[in-house]
From Swiss-Prot:
Effect of mutating residue 18 to F: In strain: Gbbkj16015a, Gbbkj16024b, Gbbkj16025b, Gbbkj16032b and Gbng3347f
Location(s) in or outside the cell: Secreted
Signal peptide: 1-25
Disulphide-bonded residues: 65-92, 78-98, 82-100
Record-linked SUPFAM superfamilies: Scorpion toxin-like
Name recorded for this polypeptide: Defensin
Main localization, broad class: secreted
Amino acid sequence: MKCATIVCTIAVVLAATLLNGSVQAAPQEEAALSGGANLNTLLDELPEETHHAALENYRAKRATCDLASGFGVGSSLCAAHCIARRYRGGYCNSKAVCVCRN
């Protein structure tokens, strides 16, 4: 009986918390939608800014080959990485980049 009371109390508190959070979030969403001119989209950015953002976020596929090569398991990790991505395996090439097989 005590267990059921505790579970019901926790459920009521969680429901009240979630309901309160959704009610408070609604005015912010309405304010964002009403100020449509202030929304930032990808089309608002200049191509040069987009290019620089892409270069900042560029990441070469070298982690499995470079970092694991010191332990002698680079090709095995590369093959496992490629199998996880639904390829038939993979290997580390001469530039220490993981190459997945079709």
